[in-house]
Amino acid sequence: MQGQGMDSMFAMEELSLMGIAEILPKYRHLKRRIRETADAVIAAKPDVLITIDSPDFCLRVARLVKAGSNVRTVHYVAPTVWAWRAGRAEKMARHIDHVLALFPFETPFMQAAGMDCDFVGHPVAAEPPVTPDELRAFDEKYGLGRGTECMVILPGSRRSEVERMGPIFGQTFAQADLG
């Protein structure tokens, strides 16, 4: 988004934390960033606040914005309330007006909690399927024969997550029987 002209109030790396061990030492700083962000939104008086993913940060900002203004709130990427902590949807509905969901089955969960919700699709799911020619080219490029098993390791996007989980993924890969 910065590449498209958005000015960020701070580096997003400040929020790329996982687990209590990373969050606790920075708790006060994170609380300050939430307050600063909410105050900036309230001062700007936008027609709508659109928050994107990062529910632990964004939903706290939205709560403060709703408490201090009449700004409509839209959240892109529904939290996985269908998988765990279902009560989050009802809490979220107190300060989120509309949700843009990645998956069609999320819409009823959000609506049942009291939010408007539209299924907008997942960027990866929108990709066209691989063609047989592309699959053959991939097999040839990497020396795979037809029917060869292939393991894909997707460690995540946060540096701390990759650093922490990388060795575990490596051990898992080493133990995998791909024969």
Task: Identify the role of each PLM range.
Residues 137-179:
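Active-site donor-nucleotide binding/catalytic segment of nucleotide-sugar enzymes
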